[in-house]
Design a protein with these regions (language model features):
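P-loop NTP-binding module
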Residues: 1-168
């Protein structure tokens, strides 16, 4: 499988940009040395500022260090992680949360929504179908349950969030 140009940390691990991501990873780990960081949200003010690029490369860098990482594309209107990783766009986060809402939360199967990537230790949950209510889904009881369940099976969850200016 072809390594995507956006995944500089995977494509060119000795580049200066990859070193910046490793430094960022180390700084995040150092800041949280007293307690284990499990969830990291990457966002921006406006679209096009590079949050998806930062999220994907930071996820790769944590995975390269041996951490089991799940990258969640929570930008349900304009999610790009599936294109960055060459994955299927759905089912994804919105589909998962909708299923959880309609069924008993203990009866759903998260594995249907998690996709492997070509990066060892890195899994992806793409944004999925565009829902009518993305903001409500992100703060829902189902989202909290999903995050709590995922924390049990990985070392770190990186969330590629929505630009703050667009959230209502």
């Amino acid at each position: 499988m072809k390594i995507r140009k956006e995944l500089i940390a995977q494509r060119d691990p000795k580049s200066p940009i990859s070193e910046v991501f490793r430094t960022l990873r180390t700084n995040i780990q150092f800041m949280n040395s007293s307690k284990k960081l499990k969830t990291l949200l990457i966002t921006s003010t406006f679209p096009g500022e590079g949050k998806s690029w930062v999220s994907s490369n930071l996820a790769v860098t944590f995975a390269q260090a041996g951490n089991r990482v799940i990258l969640i594309d929570a930008d349900m209107r304009k999610g790009r992680q599936y294109t960055i990783f060459g994955a299927a766009p759905k089912p994804g986060l919105s589909n998962c949360l909708a299923e959880m809402e309609m069924t008993n939360q203990n009866d759903w199967d998260i594995s249907r929504y998690i996709q492997k990537t070509e990066v060892e230790n890195l899994l992806l949950i793409p944004a999925g179908s565009i829902p009518p209510n993305p903001s409500e889904l992100l703060v829902s009881e189902q989202m909290m349950k999903l995050l709590n369940d995922l924390k049990e099976v990985c070392d770190l969850i990186i969330i590629d969030g929505t630009p703050c200016e667009l959230v209502t």
